[in-house]
UniProtKB/Swiss-Prot annotation:
Keyword terms of this UniProt record: Glycosyltransferase, Lipid A biosynthesis, Lipid biosynthesis, Lipid metabolism, Transferase
Function: Condensation of UDP-2,3-diacylglucosamine and 2,3-diacylglucosamine-1-phosphate to form lipid A disaccharide, a precursor of lipid A, a phosphorylated glycolipid that anchors the lipopolysaccharide to the outer membrane of the cell.
Name of the protein: Lipid-A-disaccharide synthase
Pathway it works in: Glycolipid biosynthesis; lipid IV(A) biosynthesis; lipid IV(A) from (3R)-3-hydroxytetradecanoyl-[acyl-carrier-protein] and UDP-N-acetyl-alpha-D-glucosamine: step 5/6
Gene (UniProt): lpxB
Superkingdom of origin: Bacteria
Biological source species: Shigella flexneri serotype 5b (strain 8401)
GO CC, any one term: membrane
EC number: 2.4.1.182
Catalyzed chemical reaction(s): 2-N,3-O-bis[(3R)-3-hydroxytetradecanoyl]-alpha-D-glucosaminyl 1-phosphate + UDP-2-N,3-O-bis[(3R)-3-hydroxytetradecanoyl]-alpha-D-glucosamine = lipid A disaccharide (E. coli) + UDP + H(+); a lipid X + a UDP-2-N,3-O-bis[(3R)-3-hydroxyacyl]-alpha-D-glucosamine = a lipid A disaccharide + UDP + H(+)
GO molecular function, one term: lipid-A-disaccharide synthase activity
Amino acid sequence: MTDQRPLTIALVAGETSGDILGAGLIRALKERVPNARFVGVAGPRMQAEGCEAWYEIEELAVMGIVEVLGRLRRLLHIRADLTKRFGELKPDVFVGIDAPDFNITLEGNLKKQGIKTIHYVSPSVWAWRQKRVFKIGRATDLVLAFLPFEKAFYDKYNVPCRFIGHTMADAMPLDPDKNGARDVLGIPYDAHCLALLPGSRGAEVEMLSADFLKTAQLLRQTYPDLEIVVPLVNAKRREQFERIKAEVAPDLSVHLLDGMGREAMVASDAALLASGTAALECMLAKCPMVVGYRMKPFTFWLAKRLVKTDYVSLPNLLAGRELVKELLQEECEPQKLAAALLPLLANGKTSHAMHDTFRELHQQIRCNADEQAAQAVLELAQ
């Protein structure tokens, strides 16, 4: 940091989730250093906090091999331009927020020019393609990790890493208002309630919806009053789910929701969901769950050989044991899913024990992540 200019932080966020993280980080930094300058690739939230956008976030937000290949020349041009302009600007710290395929190479380019670099949000190196940890170690001065087992992984390879807690854990209350969520969704307080979350991607909804619906039909036989809520991320996924339901379970009454996944989890006695961030959110909502997941046979075969962890869901990875049932591939079928969910819907010892462990894990990762990230940036900038 020089006396002639304000603290200057360069940031690159690659998608909406990164824009949210970036905005929280900028807000926390401005509280400590009001005249700091922020520049880089930013979305509307980061810009609203005062970040100067050299490129809009949409430029980097591409998914899938075909889309990336179609935009590759443009992406490479942006990375080369940022390498040059950040090299001239010499920010006090560069923060690459997620988007590892784009940011880690950029971080390496900048580190070679003497710029201090942080990678915010660890890629899943602990799960697969573990050798990426060496590239990350060469490219960054510090990794900011959401989860404690991520820091333990980096420590093993002597890559500087700081566990800052998870922003989602900060945003969600330790004791959610179940009745309040039921009021919002129109669910009676005394009814049994099941949330079905078949995923946010088209392929997931296609592979999981039929089995999830058949599971709900089986559970209705035991609990005739069972309310079923199905939050879907957008109109496309809703249309897809409705088509599958018309074929598989046309007479099954369900509450279809546009978004409102968090409310559905808080309101429910149990959830059946695809793995991913939804499992972490469900844990933070204190909703007992079963994880069911299917993929194409070759993809599953490949994943089994690449993935180095014993579990796929974040609650189990955090607990270091099978806290929630994971039924994958052939095991992801209605009879087994229903059998795993029945004791959870009973609201007995099983679900109470799970709820208590969820609360303990929530406290472990509720560390005021924005403040922790800001502190790490300022320490590196010294």
